Amino acid sequence: TNMSVGLTCRDRLHMIYVENRLPPEASLLRMDIGLKLPMATTSAGRAYYCAISDKGRKVITDAMEAKYGDAWPEKQEGLERSMEDYKKYGFCLSLGEWDRNINSAGVPIHLQDGTIMALTCAAPSYLISGEKLRESIAHQLAMLASDIESLGV
């Protein structure tokens, strides 16, 4: 598929790309290393948020509520929906919520030292529907994350 695949880590209320692979024809999806993504609306951020401890999640939730103010209820709804998906399926989605033209899936990767990162795949919404992402690609991404964790990194 014509999707970008990326690895992100947390920086306050953002996720930062530390590695990324783009398809050669990617014009809409320029996710360069070092790019900061908002935690609340991206699949990377949501995957991280869902995978951390309740205590850690409370700290982040309080900080996001203060940051977003009146926009917080909409962001909170997206995070709650992602938590439901994560508990059921092991992945999180962002279907046009960060960028209306981008659909993405994210899964956490738990490293042996306790660090949590997020693995993502994303594509323009005209190439990958939310349904295809949910029914096929996100499950494959979750299996890839599990394979990476089993390597003991």
Predicted regions and their residues:
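Structural motif
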Residues: 4, 15, 104, 116-118
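Generic alpha-helical structural context detector
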Residues: 46-50, 84, 146
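Sensor-regulatory modules in signal-transduction proteins
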Residues: 109-112
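Amphipathic alpha-helical effector-binding/dimerization core
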Residues: 1-63
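Juxtadomain coupling helices with adjacent low-complexity linkers
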Residues: 76, 89, 100-101, 116-153
